[in-house]
Amino acid sequence: GVIGNAQATPYGIGPRTVSLVQIRKNIYCISPGVLAQTGMETFSIVKGIVDEMKPDLIIAIDSLAARNISRVTTTIQLTDTGIIPGSGIGNNREGLNRENLGCPVIAIGVPMVVHSVTIVNDTMDKLIYLLSQNMENNCIQKVFEDFTVEEKYQLFAEIMTEDIGQMFVTPKDVDEIVDNLSTIIANSINRL
């Protein structure tokens, strides 16, 4: 199974991968789309197929939202705990996992977008670090020294949400990146 919106390039890693997987006996592929396209929850579509086809394993492929700038488009994450569609952008849906579907779920996720708050947070962390290396009395560092990592992130989120709402950023060469990463993932699946 594949998750994602083929109409939005950074979220199209799943649908693009499925288009490259070689369909063989006992290997099924589906790109269920998103609720706005189909009117159906991804979980409901996948659950119906699982109940009918009784697969031994599900491989769910989806784009992720990174919590660190350096991870955007640089990693392919694998897990056997499933995936929750939409959770990276605050749009939680029913999880695709063993508990909900009754069979093992391998999730392949690629961080394709980063929240604007994460960019500000990571930039501030770097600024504070650089200033602390060059200044004895770093007033910016002192402002944030009592904040936990999550409290600092929440502060930036509250400030920015007032002005720009929920904004996600992706690299400018995202089309090429999606093609390359989809090919890597599909070639790996084709070797199974």
Predicted regions and their residues:
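Catalytic-core regions of hydrolytic enzymes
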Residues: 33-58, 63-64
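Short acidic, glycine/serine/threonine-rich loops at helix termini
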Residues: 10-15, 40-43, 69-73, 118-120
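Gly/Ser/Thr-rich loops at beta-strand to alpha-helix junctions
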Residues: 2-11, 35-37, 63-67
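Conserved active-site and cofactor/substrate-binding residues in soluble primary-metabolism enzymes
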Residues: 12, 16, 41-45, 53, ...
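Short, surface-exposed basic-aromatic patches at helix termini and helix-loop junctions that form
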Residues: 20-22, 47-54, 77-80
